[in-house]
Amino acid sequence: MKKSLIALTLAALPVAAMADVTLYGTIKTGVETSRSVEHNGGQVVSVETGTGIVDLGSKIGFKGQEDLGNGLKAIWQVEQKASIAGTDSGWGNRQSFIGLKGGFGKLRVGRLNSVLKDTGDINPWDSKSDYLGVNKIAEPEARLISVRYDSPEFAGLSGSVQYALNDNVGRHNSESYHAGFNYKNGGFFVQYGGAYKRHQDVDDVKIEKYQIHRLVSGYDNDALYASVAVQQQDAKLVEDNSHNSQTEVAATLAYRFGNVTPRVSYAHGFKGSVDDAKRDNTYDQVVVGAEYDFSKRTSALVSAGWLQEGKGENKFVATAGGVGLRHKF
């Protein structure tokens, strides 16, 4: 019996040496409640309330690499949503890819985070409700079926370029070009992400040319995180010669005290949108909350949010609160 076990172990050693596969994931759920009031002409025209048990973005994934020699490695990842509320389906519906990595950097093909999405730490909240995260400025972020190259880091500076065909769904179903850079020096950092698209449809509005730019700067170490972001979108409509633009700003501050990390975010949108430069869609949003770490993998979450769109007699005001639990593996 012992000889059989030894033989089996020895036979498995070459497989273990060649394979480097990691199973990972996050399970997170909570209870959220919200109330929204819409005003038109100074009158309340609708009131909506709701409370529910929600999934906060659970996921499961597999990733690995193979050493091809001479410093070159094959890399791959398959990641999918894993809602404990049973509302997500499909396979590889999060970031999933295959590629090569070496001294030249990293080249990947698949369903990949856009360069803009990789600057998304400005919105660190685990939430389902749009009122419990600075989600309006984060709305253009996406995962795209694309090819992407990430350079190695030189003196704290690295860059990325990405190309997507019109193989994506919804508002991202258009040919697009993406670029960005990251600079780190100690705890200080600067990030830029941008994209250019042609012939895009957003909410049934036909756009001939569209571009977006986001610049994020801040400081991040083991205890303190602080960042400020500015984002501008610009669009030329098919049936309109004018360029419509929208500018948004956001800031996030967090500090870790032992096992507790309180956090606050603020976002503001200025007048104007990509479909109408004169549209008054000004908004203000505040989210406050905290995390308590029971361990390195398990944390309790609590947050509260407030959002106001418009002002005066015509406005939309929403408040929300949530508690949750998150476990990483």
UniProtKB/Swiss-Prot annotation:
<dbReference type="InterPro" id="IPR023614">
    <property type="entry name" value="Porin_dom_sf"/>
</dbReference>
<dbReference type="Pfam" id="PF00267">
    <property type="entry name" value="Porin_1"/>
</dbReference>
<keyword id="KW-0998">Cell outer membrane</keyword>
<dbReference type="InterPro" id="IPR013793">
    <property type="entry name" value="Porin_Gram-ve_CS"/>
</dbReference>
<keyword id="KW-0406">Ion transport</keyword>
<dbReference type="GO" id="GO:0034220">
    <property type="term" value="P:monoatomic ion transmembrane transport"/>
</dbReference>
<keyword id="KW-0813">Transport</keyword>
<dbReference type="GO" id="GO:0015288">
    <property type="term" value="F:porin activity"/>
</dbReference>
<keyword id="KW-0472">Membrane</keyword>
<keyword id="KW-0812">Transmembrane</keyword>
<protein>
    <recommendedName>
        <fullName>Major outer membrane protein P.IB</fullName>
    </recommendedName>
</protein>
<keyword id="KW-0732">Signal</keyword>
<dbReference type="GO" id="GO:0046930">
    <property type="term" value="C:pore complex"/>
</dbReference>
<dbReference type="InterPro" id="IPR050298">
    <property type="entry name" value="Gram-neg_bact_OMP"/>
</dbReference>
<keyword id="KW-0626">Porin</keyword>
<dbReference type="GO" id="GO:0009279">
    <property type="term" value="C:cell outer membrane"/>
</dbReference>
<keyword id="KW-1134">Transmembrane beta strand</keyword>
<comment type="subunit">
    <text>Homotrimer.</text>
</comment>
<dbReference type="InterPro" id="IPR001702">
    <property type="entry name" value="Porin_Gram-ve"/>
</dbReference>
<dbReference type="InterPro" id="IPR002299">
    <property type="entry name" value="Porin_Neis"/>
</dbReference>
<feature type="signal peptide">
    <location>
        <begin position="1"/>
        <end position="19"/>
    </location>
</feature>
<comment type="similarity">
    <text>Belongs to the Gram-negative porin family.</text>
</comment>
<comment type="function">
    <text>Serves as a slightly cation selective porin.</text>
</comment>
<dbReference type="InterPro" id="IPR033900">
    <property type="entry name" value="Gram_neg_porin_domain"/>
</dbReference>
